[in-house]
Amino acid sequence: MNLNFNIKKDFKNIEVFPTAGALGAQIENVNLSDNLPDNIIEEIYDALLTYQVIFFRNQKFEPRTQKAFAERIGKPIVYPFVKSLDEFPEITPILKKETDINNFGGIWHSDTTYQEEPPMGTMLYGIEIPHYGGDTEWSNQYLAYESLSEGMKKFLNTLEAVNISGKARVAKTRSDIMKHASVGLKGDELRAVHPVVRTHPETKRKSLYVNEAHTTNFVGMTEEESQPILEFLFNIKLNQNSLVDLDGSQDQLQYGIIDAQCTILLMIITAKEG
């Protein structure tokens, strides 16, 4: 089996360092709040397509400059469940208080697959990060698909899956943050159907497009019938070298860009010291 793991690619205008064998890269000596020339933006985007998750250290953004940068990469949208900044509805603060016990995003997921047109990516800006914990993992869903047998690939390519916003486990991860910043939506209001295997519109590579947080069943099958196959697909990330981990405690002011079309992620729940 020939899996396409992370390889070093040369860039002319930016310094890119792969961070793991499966996906992820660190980009150095770029200030994202500057009015960067088009050739730099193009290479940043190329790095995103190549490595699926890219990180930038020591970034300082105001909401205005963060939105301006995001608009050069894609089209920012509004997250439907949590209150955003008043003047910048595309930016959603993710705040965890000392008394909160649930991690927002603390289940393997791809963002908002319950929407008819989910976003192509997500941008995360770590402003105040704990010295202990705060880690995030990503899984390369290209590799998840490529690890399958030809028979399983052929079968999955015929399927579509239902995705909803209100599965019990993901609703629980929102519970603390929605106490403080809910916009009033009920968890089961949003639903969409997507192919189980999607082809990336730019790289043309195939990847799995199901996730534990939102996918409930295959179209034409009950949840009970779908569950064994879905559980197998959900667990592929644990059975192969498809992961990268970001130790959030190492850097404040860290910026990440994720290609949501071919990755899933998990905000790790860390036990308290002592």
Regions found by a protein language model. Give the residues of each.
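Non-heme Fe(II) oxygenase catalytic core, chiefly the N-lobe of the double-stranded beta-helix
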Residues: N2-Q252, I258-G274
